[in-house]
């Protein structure tokens, strides 16, 4: 279930780029600028400049960070993408896994307001995020102290990822829907609903970070 969207304020003339994207964007834009400047008067150079400019444009699209309007619900999606699984766990929690493909926004958001009590980075592999062995991938494990108890969110690296970029330290207060971090390229985010909270999404459903409600009343 996706709550009604509210206006997120005036449109930006220049799209926001995600924090942590500069190491990728600066070289891409620099190369594109040089390719354009050196292509004048040469058809061959112009032809060579096209893929360089296209790559820079693709990078800008990938690292876009659009504003999202406020939405209602105890739990909102932490990621854009498609629900990969909804798994009840032995401890009573429910794990909702959202797979992000390279075309999705890769900035992740807090599913609920709270205080960050843990930000643990675990190194690992870089298997496809939909692979069953991706449980051994690099990840960042977030824990939040919230009004409904402890909530866990896990950012999981995918096949093309080489870094997860957290935005907040332990002790930080975050609002629901606030940006918490970036995963570069295709990846997955898991949200763990506490015991007694039923999921409102199903496998295959498209979700948007900070807008799609994950729980039922």
Swiss-Prot record:
It is an enzyme of class 4 (lyase). GO terms for biological process: phosphatidylethanolamine biosynthetic process. It is found in: Cell membrane. It comes from the Bacteria. This is Phosphatidylserine decarboxylase proenzyme. It comes from Thermobifida fusca (strain YX). Heterodimer of a large membrane-associated beta subunit and a small pyruvoyl-containing alpha subunit. Its main location: membrane. Disulfide bonds: none annotated. It catalyses: a 1,2-diacyl-sn-glycero-3-phospho-L-serine + H(+) = a 1,2-diacyl-sn-glycero-3-phosphoethanolamine + CO2. Catalyzes the formation of phosphatidylethanolamine (PtdEtn) from phosphatidylserine (PtdSer). Keywords: Cell membrane, Decarboxylase, Lipid biosynthesis, Lipid metabolism, Lyase, Membrane, Phospholipid biosynthesis, Phospholipid metabolism, Pyruvate, Zymogen. The record marks 186-187 as: Cleavage (non-hydrolytic).
């Amino acid at each position: 279930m996706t709550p009604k969207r509210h206006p997120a304020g005036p449109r930006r003339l220049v799209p926001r780029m995600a924090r942590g994207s500069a190491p990728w964007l600066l070289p891409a834009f620099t190369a594109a600028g040089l390719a354009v400047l050196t292509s004048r008067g040469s058809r061959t150079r112009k032809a060579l400049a096209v893929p360089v400019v296209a790559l820079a444009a693709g990078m800008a699209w990938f690292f876009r960070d659009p504003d999202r309007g406020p939405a209602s619900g105890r739990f909102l999606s932490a990621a854009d993408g498609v629900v990969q699984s909804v798994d009840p766990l032995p401890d009573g929690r429910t794990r909702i896994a959202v797979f992000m493909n390279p075309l999705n926004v890769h900035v992740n958001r807090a599913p609920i307001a709270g205080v960050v009590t843990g930000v643990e980075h675990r190194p690992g592999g870089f298997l496809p995020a939909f692979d069953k062995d991706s449980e051994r991938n690099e990840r960042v494990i977030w824990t939040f102290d919230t009004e409904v108890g402890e909530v866990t969110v896990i950012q999981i690296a995918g096949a093309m990822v080489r870094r997860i970029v957290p935005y907040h330290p332990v002790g930080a207060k975050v609002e629901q829907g606030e940006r918490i971090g970036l995963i570069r390229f295709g990846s997955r985010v898991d949200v763990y609903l506490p015991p007694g909270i039923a999921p409102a999404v199903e496998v295959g459903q498209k979700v948007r970070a900070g807008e799609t409600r994950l729980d039922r009343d």
